[in-house]
């Protein structure tokens, strides 16, 4: 069974892209045809619009990018209908040949961590849950024993996790940059990530434990690429948050793989951007999504 890291790096090389399209549906920003389809903001109606929106994005970017990243929170806020929608979106992405990284930032210890992992990791039958994804973002705050249950499920299901190491938000440094015993917290987390990977490397030297490192901190991105040579990096903060193409190239290995760069708003709401003209009724919004994806691919190639 091909490991998660092997699958993702192969998809990067196959598509010639390191772009990860973030699926963050927001009702007020949906294209007009989808906003108009929502009945009195009923949650089941909003969920149906989210499913259609995300699935049409998937259809627009399939073959152009290696992966998509649905943000679980936007679906969870709709209750049961939203969770059904999330499952439908994940399944559609799998069927389209895209790797799915669910952004849930889960964490706990023992059996609860295993339950989270069972719910969100593994896209292959017979183990697949309704939300079974190829990878999941996780928090390291509870320590090593909170990550090990996720890694054990990754081993069984050829899945992956992305551990929050140095995040792109301005307030992340409040904890992540604290120094303890001569090392910052993010450096200690990076060491843990590398340790968890060491016995799990594929032929290219990558393990199932990836890391989230923000493009908004380019010096730390260079530092952490060296500190975690066995981890695929998930790099948020490109575009809307200010990270540049030059900044994020440092995350990639010599083959142009080893990292994926996330963009959500700049792609999925591209119909709102003046440079991508769409019809007045926004009926061709999918064209803007595709054009924005191609633009980002070209920017990252340099």
From Swiss-Prot:
Q: Which GO terms describe its molecular function?
A: orotidine-5'-phosphate decarboxylase activity
Associated pathway: Pyrimidine metabolism; UMP biosynthesis via de novo pathway; UMP from orotate: step 2/2
Say which species the protein is native to: Rhodopirellula baltica (strain DSM 10527 / NCIMB 13988 / SH1)
Which SUPFAM superfamilies does the entry link to?
Ribulose-phoshate binding barrel
According to the record, the segments passing through the membrane are none
- What is any one GO biological process for this UniProt entry? 'de novo' pyrimidine nucleobase biosynthetic process
Originating gene: pyrF
Tell whether RNA-binding is among the UniProt keywords. no
Q: Record's HAMAP family? A: OMPdecase_type2 (MF_01215)
Q: What class of enzyme is it?
A: lyase
What is the protein's name according to its record? Orotidine 5'-phosphate decarboxylase
